[in-house]
Amino acid sequence: MKDLLQQLTSHYRLTKEEAKEAMLAIGNGKINAAQVAAFISVYMMRSITVAELQGFREALLEMCLDADLSEYDPIDIVGTGGDGKDTFNISTLSCFVVAGAGIKVAKHGNYAVSSSCGSSNVVEYLGYKFSNSKDVLRKQIEEANFCMLHAPLFHPALKNVAPVRKELGMRTIYNMLGPLVNPALPTYHLLGTFNMDLARLYGYIHQSLNSKFAIVHALDGYDEISLTGGFKVISNQLDRVLEPDDMGLHTYKAAELSGGKTVEDAAKIFIEVLENKSTRAQKEVVLANAGLAISIAKPDISLFDAIATARESLESGQAYECFKKAVK
């Protein structure tokens, strides 16, 4: 690893195979914490290549527990995190709205590293029980149209980098990798990125995998559709910038999307959205993301119709019913 680190500090780009071997070595605990921190830091100072990202992804999937749920044709809705925006849990709420519309969801998530409350924090606080049992996950996705794969339970290799990530307290290559290494192997993907370069990288990765996907990046930095302005969409069908009114929705201020300072704050907003008692801004930003997700899983309907489907799921209480079944 010393030699590799020396090469990396001299602007060397890893091949796919070298990247995979490096990630396997880290995951298997063969690299000390100082070297892990140095390795991670390289990618905080320069952009990652497609080959490196592919190699890292392959290594993490090779080391993860089997949880293949592809027979259910599920979707994952996930952002990289690390955008520094501290929004409420938009992607996770969108999952339940999509589930309420009859689409299976296999959500890959984790505790917060660089924000106040991650997807795992809020669903656990509200009563969801994490499991890495395939039988439990099958039961959940069959009964609630939703299951959550809490990353540390499926990626034991991550335990070797968790302390370093926590100490760094900022986005790292692992933020980039999280959305790419869902052990459920979902059929459909809605991925949010914190910058445009990563959106393009994700696009290349998913095109090479023949995935059914959409990647979003809000032009003002959010890793999801924020309705605070324009946002880029890269998908099997689209590669363009959309505005909120292209979806029949309104534009909002960043402050209207705040997730609060604590898990309790985030959980309060979460339930208010599911009970259809939230602010219009909170409701519409969830509908925007859920609507785009529905349009990926149902490409034969328009984006407007997909948003209408999302609205029906939320306003009818079906989204909340899926949540209650998931946490029972």
Curated annotation (Swiss-Prot):
Q: What is its EC number?
A: 2.4.2.18
Which residues take part in binding anthranilate 2?
Answer: 165
Report residues binding anthranilate 1: 79, 110
Task: Give the gene symbol.
Answer: trpD
- Any idea which UniProt keywords this protein has? Amino-acid biosynthesis, Aromatic amino acid biosynthesis, Glycosyltransferase, Magnesium, Metal-binding, Transferase, Tryptophan biosynthesis
Positions contributing to Mg(2+) 1 binding:
91, 224
Identify the pathway: Amino-acid biosynthesis; L-tryptophan biosynthesis; L-tryptophan from chorismate: step 2/5
Enumerate the Pfam families for this protein.
Glycos_trans_3N (PF02885), Glycos_transf_3 (PF00591)
- Kindly list the cofactors needed: Mg(2+)
Q: What class of enzyme is it?
A: transferase
Q: What does this protein do?
A: Catalyzes the transfer of the phosphoribosyl group of 5-phosphorylribose-1-pyrophosphate (PRPP) to anthranilate to yield N-(5'-phosphoribosyl)-anthranilate (PRA).
Its BP terms in the Gene Ontology are:
L-tryptophan biosynthetic process
Identify its protein family. Belongs to the anthranilate phosphoribosyltransferase family.
Record-given protein name: Anthranilate phosphoribosyltransferase
